[in-house]
Amino acid sequence: PGWHIECSAISLKHLGEHLDIHCGGIDNAFPHHTNEIAQSEAYIGHKWCNYWFHVLHLNTNSGKMSKSTGEFLTVSLLEEKGYNPLAYRFFCLQSHYRKSLVFSYENLDNAQGAFNKLLAKIAALKDDENEAIDEAAVKELTEKFKAALDNDINTSLGITVLYDVLKAKTNDKTKLALLAEFDKVLSLNLLDEAKKLKEDKKEEASSV
């Protein structure tokens, strides 16, 4: 029981008595989340969470990734191996949460390559103070991004909208504003990472 009670206590203390979205692994659905709901709502006297979603397991080619098998990832391990942890996040976001995701370093290499290419395209954008925000483009692309996330939190479709922004026939200032807004959901730190990539390339060029 302590496991269930501590989660209710922590979330009520730090997040308040009403949550919009609560997520977890598919193995948390029962009995952990059902117990959380029962005890939290009995305590606060009203509905606790609006939405629940449960992510399927991260697997390797040999099966489920878990501590018990000795096969699991940590951010520090990825960093030790030279990976940007945000590339791993990008890798995860490219799959739907209802699908089991197969991890391999080859797949992560592909994701990191794609993430770096995305950052390079963003780094090439220029924020011109004299340009005005294209409100029509903002409306169209924001609706497209929201539709992707409203479709059962389809993050992979949301990622494709980032590329739609980059290809859109609008000015760079608008593109940067849209990317910053969408990144509030995706948390890929796109603009800062793109700026860092740009600065690293300048340093490399100056050292040659």
Name these PLM-found stretches:
Residues 67-208:
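Conserved nucleotide- and phosphate/pyrophosphate-binding catalytic cores
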Residues 1-125:
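Alpha-helical recognition segments enriched in aromatics with Gly/Pro capping
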